[in-house]
Amino acid sequence: MEMKGLKNIRKQKNYSQLKVAMDLSISRESLSYYENGKRSPDINLLVIFSKYYNVSIDYLITGKEFEKK
């Protein structure tokens, strides 16, 4: 599953893949795989990404914030 918001938020914050990977103690290659849908992060890692970027898990997956109806 491609993580549209994961790549978008990293680019919005002008963070390199290397910076994020080092901050979160994961490999840059793994981050690239997550961003491009070659691998899916487990729920624990999604929570870590969500806290790191201060965005919802919905945003990380879809690239859109959850909208209340």
Whereabouts are the PLM-identified features?
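Residues within the helices of the helix-turn-helix
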Residues: K7, L18, E29, I43, ...
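Conserved hydrophobic/aromatic packing and binding residues within compact polymer-binding modules
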Residues: L6, V20-A21, L31-Y34, L60
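Recognition helix of helix-turn-helix/homeodomain-like DNA-binding domains
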Residues: I26-S40
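Short, charged recognition helix plus adjacent turn
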Residues: N8, Q12, I61-K69
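Short basic helix-loop element that most often maps to the first helix and adjoining turn
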Residues: K4-D23
